[in-house]
Amino acid sequence: MLTILFLGDIVGEPGRNAVISRLPELKAKYGVDFIIVNGENAAGGRGITGKITIDLLRSGVSVITTGDHIWDQKEISAFIETEPRLLRPINYPEGAPGHGSIVLETTQGKVGVINVQCRTFMLPILENPFRVMQAAVEKMRTETSVIVVDVHGETTSEKIALGRFLAGKVSAVLGTHTHVQTADEQIFPGGTAFLCDAGMCGPVNSIIGRAVEPIVQRFISNLPAQFPVATGEVRLRGALVEIDETTGRALRISRIDEAAASSGESQSEGTLENEYKNEQENG
């Protein structure tokens, strides 16, 4: 069995520091074999830098996915060509820097990751994700049956539609972008784990990771404003997916909601964690 930890959008320094500090403990706690994080908001809430990419990979992250903010830091266009484990959405036009997919060798066999961006209410409007994914999955399945897809999109309907479209063809379809964790984790027919949105790794006393007051005032005044990353309590949210490495079928999916501090420093919320422990103990 292959256990994959997938963490939602990392927001700014609070989010990335929490991920880096907690990853070793989470890896041991859940028996994680492979770690995927969405890093498109890791640099001050907008984009990602080369240094942040390296820091995350050194901390134990296997693959970093992104989305519509991938190009927000100017340096990334050149850097992404040098680091294949940093993905941009696969449905950018041909010739865009970097790659939208990767297959990595692990002790449990090969694991494929594909990053795709939806189109509804999303800018820039990229190539049709359904058509692009059909071709990408067919190609990747010649190398491995274990395929995890990060679907970066605004609407639940488009992400669910992509999940249904890929059911039975990939191991997991996990949504990112909204920073709000959904409660619809399930396994589609054919063994594809699905979660509409993994949520974020960032400050919870916020509006999707940003300071509250500037955003509220923006809605009131319609005037331009800066939205700094919030401070305070940080939580790590995402999903844990267990996969049969031979067939590529998902066996189980559960949501993750962990405190930034280790269990020895601060008590985690515990509901999902306790459910996981009980299931493990009861076989």
Predicted features along the sequence, with ranges:
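Acidic, metal/ion-coordinating pockets
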Residues: 1-283
